[in-house]
Amino acid sequence: MSPESRKLLNIIILGIGFMFMFTAFQTSGNVAQTVISSLNSTSFHGSGYTSLAIIYSVFSASNLIAPSIVAVIGCQMSMFLSGLLYSAYIAMFIQPYTWSFYTLSVLIGIAAAVLWTAQGSCLTINSDDTTIGKHSGIFWALLQFSMLFGNLFIYLAWKGEINISDSDRRTVFIALTVISLVGSVLFFLIRTPESDDAQEDDISNSAADAEGTMSAQSCFAKAIDAFKRSLKLSITKEMLLLSILVAYTGLELTFYSGVYGTCIGSMKVFEADAKSLIGLSGIFVGLGEVLGGGLFGLLGKYNYFGRNPVVILGVVVHFLAFYMIYLYMPSDAPIASREGTYLRAFINPSKTIALACSFLLGLGDSCYNTQMLSILGSLYPDNSAPAFAVFKFVQSVSAAVAFFYSNYLLLHWQLLILVIFGFFGTISFFFVEWGLTRRSQYNSM
């Protein structure tokens, strides 16, 4: 097998591994609050929203130490061990306890930072300037399929269920745990790409022997340097402007991945189909993500009009989804009790409207994320690692904040926050894109 084919195979394995892991994890996140509300045990007092807030809070802080962990144990082992912690979190729902629920929420926050740092390193190692776009598109598409498969399983498993029984919960989460473990094991199939220059290995080995005890000091110095560059980059004008939209992506991530499914599941108007609609909603979010990822990721090289039109599409479809949700969904849906809500909004709700909103949420999310990754790569080609570290930090902090307030705010207040950040974030993105375009035109003169 040629080196290029080996690298492509590694990317495919990486994408399939993440697809399995996040099929299990995202499905767990979508149904966590609904499952907890249906628990028969009175000794469990956890909150799915609080758990996800803890995960994203710890994830934010752990981005500072994740590169050091990956440097010490390597990409492959980092992804495998992180995958085991993901599996442990999912397995906890088989027999949940409050202490294990929140303890694993902390551990999986650390695992998430290590996992995504290792993923970025693995993608870079197996790509070059001519293949990074294609490889990123392949990985994105495979990852987004995770939204489809797990939620299809939930839809089929819970169709017709009003309350989730203990046996149904155990069956679902045993299956999800196995799926997550399969994804973790797949990382061991990734092989280090062969060097085009055989002498490079000899030079590297000789250098490693010569450095001896200096290696640890060198790694520490590199970690400190990367941390300093991240701090400097975070206060640049472009990054401060982009941070508004990055924060919005964290807020809307919380909404479509945790809050919206819970709202659907709490609506008594859907009767026996309410719980299974959670899974079907996740499927339609995934369809929107895959469609957007294909159009703006894999076909991005044919985009001659810049990034602004795609971002405009994103804000239009998201605001349309928010308006429809405001019209059909009762305001107490996010914080309804186990019995659900009997309130009505302004129009009669329907499954068609609910699923159409799910699709629009996924499509809009893919618009924002593909263009955000693109503009960061264009702005900071020589500082991509610090740039994406800042991106993940801001996104995860805003997601954590959103999960905290989701426990208390009525739906219309949550939608208002999304609209405000979405509007001003889009405007700030335009300013950065226009500045980048003018700079490119000036350099080409």
Curated annotation (Swiss-Prot):
<dbReference type="InterPro" id="IPR036259">
    <property type="entry name" value="MFS_trans_sf"/>
</dbReference>
<dbReference type="GO" id="GO:0016020">
    <property type="term" value="C:membrane"/>
</dbReference>
<feature type="transmembrane region" description="Helical">
    <location>
        <begin position="98"/>
        <end position="118"/>
    </location>
</feature>
<feature type="glycosylation site" description="N-linked (GlcNAc...) asparagine">
    <location>
        <position position="163"/>
    </location>
</feature>
<feature type="transmembrane region" description="Helical">
    <location>
        <begin position="138"/>
        <end position="158"/>
    </location>
</feature>
<keyword id="KW-0812">Transmembrane</keyword>
<feature type="transmembrane region" description="Helical">
    <location>
        <begin position="170"/>
        <end position="190"/>
    </location>
</feature>
<feature type="transmembrane region" description="Helical">
    <location>
        <begin position="415"/>
        <end position="435"/>
    </location>
</feature>
<feature type="transmembrane region" description="Helical">
    <location>
        <begin position="277"/>
        <end position="297"/>
    </location>
</feature>
<feature type="glycosylation site" description="N-linked (GlcNAc...) asparagine">
    <location>
        <position position="40"/>
    </location>
</feature>
<keyword id="KW-0472">Membrane</keyword>
<feature type="transmembrane region" description="Helical">
    <location>
        <begin position="309"/>
        <end position="329"/>
    </location>
</feature>
<feature type="transmembrane region" description="Helical">
    <location>
        <begin position="53"/>
        <end position="73"/>
    </location>
</feature>
<keyword id="KW-0325">Glycoprotein</keyword>
<feature type="transmembrane region" description="Helical">
    <location>
        <begin position="345"/>
        <end position="365"/>
    </location>
</feature>
<feature type="transmembrane region" description="Helical">
    <location>
        <begin position="8"/>
        <end position="28"/>
    </location>
</feature>
<keyword id="KW-1133">Transmembrane helix</keyword>
<protein>
    <recommendedName>
        <fullName>UNC93-like protein MFSD11</fullName>
    </recommendedName>
</protein>
<feature type="transmembrane region" description="Helical">
    <location>
        <begin position="239"/>
        <end position="259"/>
    </location>
</feature>
<comment type="similarity">
    <text>Belongs to the unc-93 family.</text>
</comment>
<dbReference type="Pfam" id="PF05978">
    <property type="entry name" value="UNC-93"/>
</dbReference>
<dbReference type="InterPro" id="IPR051617">
    <property type="entry name" value="UNC-93-like_regulator"/>
</dbReference>
<feature type="transmembrane region" description="Helical">
    <location>
        <begin position="385"/>
        <end position="405"/>
    </location>
</feature>
<feature type="transmembrane region" description="Helical">
    <location>
        <begin position="74"/>
        <end position="94"/>
    </location>
</feature>
<dbReference type="InterPro" id="IPR010291">
    <property type="entry name" value="Ion_channel_UNC-93"/>
</dbReference>
